[in-house]
Amino acid sequence: MNNGINVNSEIGKLKSVLLHRPGAEVENITPDTMKQLLFDDIPYLKIAQKEHDFFAQTLRDNGAETVYIENLATEVFEKSSETKEEFLSHLLHEAGYRPGRTYDGLTEYLTSMPTKDMVEKVYAGVRKNELDIKRTALSDMAGSDAENYFYLNPLPNAYFTRDPQASMGVGMTINKMTFPARQPESLITEYVMANHPRFKDTPIWRDRNHTTRIEGGDELILNKTTVAIGVSERTSSKTIQNLAKELFANPLSTFDTVLAVEIPHNHAMMHLDTVFTMINHDQFTVFPGIMDGAGNINVFILRPGQDGEVEIEHLTDLKAALKKVLNLSELDLIECGAGDPIAAPREQWNDGSNTLAIAPGEIVTYDRNYVTVELLKEHGIKVHEILSSELGRGRGGARCMSQPLWREDL
């Protein structure tokens, strides 16, 4: 077991990774709540769990320790009832509850459970019919609040452990998630990082207590000095500049360059890693749809300036920008779906660009994106194909479903 965080690249040998096994929360999605919960379809839980177990076993078979966030949270709350009560208070306040009949009823209900069951219930959500709470307000009896079946909504996106936090060097960002459906996920991370002995003294480059948003799918660690961050539907440019200032100023950080890549702001391309991932020292997957007809895309190189400020250089050529910040003479951009006008968007939608490198030139990715998989193999990449029929319904692939905690340095 490697304590703390050590992630200085996207491609170093993966030694430890944070996961969440899909649970009852997935079965609490309905057609009426799919959009609110950021899903386009409802996965079949039994098969999704089998697929996730296959994914986790693939990682273990290739030398990675699999760590489950729900187990870490259980360990933290079992160790300290005070921490558990503080977490529940924080959770309920963020859900809009204040001390009173419902708040007290939820607190009593959750604290009466064994800690493991409580953590599972936080992920699964608390239905209104689970508690005998007298409803006295009109909002409890009529209108949109009354139509909601839950006191606490489920967290079905939690198996995408990439986004609530991001390992970066020896530290981590704990992220202000864009949509309410995901915000409790990073609250769980906050309590784990602050209280689990495994992460004692781990620096937090940026916590979740901000008004501007960022998500881990937009945060890529290119090498020990350079990170790429997407300007996307889920991550704001203001956040990127503020994080760059922190990374440049903090003596525990080794980063001196941030590459900000602006991608289309839409659901299909919600994060940078849905359209661009690093798979070797000089090889990347890319979805060509992020560029305009002339092949241009807005790319910004941020470096330390005077008096704690940031200097910004604007380019419109992704390949040239990558060569510049990585000091490469050549690099290989491998197009999702081989750049075909039909195969590329189809396979990007099914996370063909969302690969997880487990070593230089060795990746894990969904089996369904066969055009991209064959092209990757032609380019010399070793590909571990994982099952995808149900997991992919949540709009995330192998990188989305994993948060590296420890990679070997290159």
Swiss-Prot record:
The active site is at residue 400. Keywords: Arginine metabolism, Cytoplasm, Hydrolase. InterPro entries: Arg_deiminase. It is found in: Cytoplasm. Gene3D superfamilies: Arginine deiminase, L-arginine/glycine Amidinotransferase, Chain A. The keyword Hydrolase applies. One of its GO terms (molecular function) is arginine deiminase activity. Its main location: cytoplasm. This is Arginine deiminase. The gene is arcA.
